Regions:
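Pre-Walker A adenine-sensing motif
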Residues: 1-16
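A cross-kingdom feature that marks ATP-driven nucleic-acid transaction machinery
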Residues: 13-20, 29, 38, 42-45, ...
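Hydrophobic anchor at the beta1->P-loop junction of P-loop NTPases
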Residues: 24
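Conserved lysine of the Walker
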Residues: 32
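Short glycine-rich substrate-engagement loop in P-loop NTPases that contacts/grips substrate
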Residues: 56-87
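Structural recognition of the conserved hydrophobic beta-strand(s) that form the central parallel beta-sheet
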Residues: 93, 117-123, 144
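Short regulatory helix/loop adjacent to the ATP-binding pocket of P-loop NTPases
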Residues: 109, 126-142, 154-159
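Interdomain hinge/linker elements that couple catalytic modules in large macromolecular machines
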Residues: 158-348, 354, 362, 368
Length: 450
C-alpha cells in the first residue's frame, strides 16, 4: 500500500548517502517491515533482511564476534542469506532490532565502514531492557511510522483525488457543499471504523466484510496482549490493567485517566512506568494537560493529568465492543450509517488524536476544574501550536463535536481569558466548513490539514 513515509526514506537515501542508518519505530503490525522491504526492492540492486524474530544463532554470533573484521562479517552474511552484496547498492534491513540490541549497537561500525545502507525497524526502542547494555549509536536517523492516515486510507480505496479537493477547500476556507461533504463524511466514517492498521485496511479493500476486518483487528489486539505479557517484565499486570481500561476511561465525559478506577487510592507514580511502556510501544497516544496556552505547551505540561487514547481508532472499536468476542457486522453497519445509539464522542475524539499525531502534533489539552472560580472552570479537548511561532497568537484551541447539537461554553470562556495568546479557535464537527464569530468550524475529515 502507498505510504507517505516512502518519501522520507527516499530523502534519507539521497541526503545521507550511507552516513547514517535509518531507524523506523512503530507499533507492531503498523507496516514497518513491509515499507522497508518495498523500498529495498524498488531502490536497491540487492537487499537482505535479518529478522530478529526468527534469526539463527549463527547470524547473531556474527554481530557479536566479527565487528572487528567486517570483510569476514559481510562474507558470512552474504553466504548465509545467499544474497550478493554490492557496495553502495545494497540495503541491509535489521528487522525488529530491539530483540537483539547488540545489532543496534553494531550500527556504529557498519555505518562507519560505508559499504552498504541500513534500515532498522522496531518497537519499544526506549525500554530499559532494550538499551541498558549498549551505547545507542549516534549514526541513526529516527522516524516514526503511525497507522495509515485518512489520505493513505483513501489511496488504498483507489481514491487519489478526494483529499486534494478537501485540501483546496481548506486552504480557501470554503465549504465543500452538500454532495461532496456527504461523500467525504462517508469515507471518513469508513476510516473511523476500519482504522489505519494496514492488514485491516487490506481486508476491507479486498472484501468489504466487517466480520473479517474485525477478526484481523482482534488478532492484532491479542498480539499486543501477548507482547505485554512477554516484554513488560515486572509490571505486566499494570500495563494490562491500563490497556484493558482505555475504552472505559474514554467513555467518560472528561476522558481524563483516573488511576483510582484501576485500584482504590492508586496514584500516577504507581503506574508511570506502565504508561511509558504503552506509549513507547506506540500502542497509545498520550495527551497531557497544559496549564496555560503559551509558546511551548510542554513547559506548562502537567504530566500527571492526562488522557490515554488508542493509537488506532479501528482497534479501539474492536477493543470496546467486545461482549461476545467479535464485533458484529450489524454493529459496524450501524456505525457506518451513523445509527448506533452510543456515545460516539470517545471514537471521534480518539480519531482526532490519531490524525493530529499522524500530522506531527504532540497532544495537549486544557483542563481547569476549579470549584471556587466557575468562570475559570473549563475543558478544551486539544491545543495545537501554529507552524510558524510569533510573539503572540500562537495556540489554537480545538473542540471536538460528534453530534449536530452542541454548545461551546468552554471554548468561549477560554477565548475570553486567553485572547492574546490564541490563534484561530477551531471546532471539528460533522457539518461543513464555516466561519462564525471568530471561530473556524471544520468538518472532521479536515483534521489532517491542521
Amino acid at each position: 500500500m502507498k505510504r507517505k513515509i516512502y518519501e522520507d526514506l527516499l530523502r534519507w537515501k539521497q541526503e545521507e548517502a550511507g552516513r547514517t542508518a535509518l531507524l523506523i519505530d512503530g507499533a507492531r503490525r503498523v507496516g514497518k517491515s513491509y515499507i522497508a522491504e518495498t523500498f529495498a526492492k524498488a531502490e536497491y540492486k540487492s537487499y537482505l533482511v535479518v529478522d530478529f524474530n526468527r534469526v539463527s544463532q549463527a547470524v547473531t554470533d556474527l554481530f557479536l564476534n566479527y565487528m572487528d573484521d567486517l570483510d569476514l562479517f559481510f562474507l558470512y552474511l552474504s553466504n548465509y542469506y545467499n544474497v550478493k552484496l554490492y557496495p553502495r547498492e545494497t540495503l541491509i534491513i535489521l528487522d525488529e532490532v530491539q530483540l537483539f540490541p547488540k545489532a543496534r549497537a553494531a550500527i556504529k561500525y557498519l555505518v562507519a565502514d560505508g559499504r552498504y545502507d541500513y534500515i532498522e525497524t522496531g518497537s519499544l526502542m526506549s525500554i530499559r531492557k532494550n538499551v541498558q547494555d549498549i551505547v545507542i549509536p549516534s549514526e541513526e536517523r529516527h522516524i516514526k511510522l503511525h497507522p495509515m492516515d485518512f489520505e493513505e486510507f483513501l489511496w488504498a480505496l483507489d481514491n487519489e483525488v478526494l483529499m486534494d479537493f478537501i485540501r483546496l477547500h481548506f486552504v480557501k476556507r470554503k465549504p465543500m457543499e452538500q454532495a461532496m461533504h456527504r461523500k467525504a463524511m462517508d469515507y471518513f466514517r469508513q476510516y473511523l471504523i476500519v482504522g489505519g492498521m494496514p492488514q485491516a485496511v487490506a481486508a476491507y479493500v479486498q472484501t468489504h466484510d466487517f466480520d473479517r476486518v474485525d477478526r484481523v483487528k482482534r488478532d492484532i489486539l491479542e498480539l499486543y496482549r501477548a507482547d505485554i505479557v512477554k516484554h513488560a517484565e515486572g509490571y505486566e499486570m499494570k500495563v494490562a490493567q491500563i490497556f484493558d481500561d482505555i475504552p472505559a476511561q474514554l467513555q467518560k465525559h472528561e476522558k481524563k485517566f483516573k488511576f483510582s478506577s484501576l485500584k482504590k487510592e492508586a496514584r500516577f507514580r504507581e503506574y508511570e512506568d506502565s504508561l511509558f511502556w504503552l506509549a513507547d510501544a506506540m500502542v497509545v497516544n498520550m495527551c497531557y494537560n497544559s496549564t496555560a496556552p503559551n509558546i511551548g505547551l510542554k513547559m506548562n505540561m502537567d504530566r500527571m493529568t492526562l488522557k490515554c487514547y488508542m493509537a488506532d481508532t479501528g482497534l479501539l472499536i474492536s477493543h470496546a465492543f467486545d461482549e461476545n468476542g467479535i464485533v458484529s457486522e450489524a454493529l459496524y453497519k450501524k456505525l457506518l450509517f451513523d445509527k448506533l445509539e452510543v456515545n460516539k464522542g470517545m471514537l471521534v475524539e480518539n480519531i482526532v488524536a490519531q490524525m493530529l499525531t499522524a500530522s506531527g502534533h504532540k497532544l495537549y489539552f486544557y483542563s481547569n476544574s476549579s470549584r471556587e472560580d466557575t468562570e475559570s472552570r473549563m475543558e478544551i479537548d486539544f491545543l495545537i501550536a501554529k507552524s510558524k511561532i510569533s510573539n503572540r497568537h500562537n495556540i489554537s484551541p480545538i473542540e471536538v463535536k460528534s453530534s449536530k447539537n452542541y454548545t461551546l461554553t468552554s471554548l468561549k470562556k477560554f477565548r475570553t481569558k486567553y485572547q492574546d495568546q490564541l490563534h484561530t479557535p477551531l471546532v471539528l464537527h460533522t457539518s461543513d466548513l464555516k466561519e462564525e464569530d471568530g471561530i473556524l468550524y471544520l468538518p472532521l475529515y479536515m483534521t489532517p490539514l491542521l
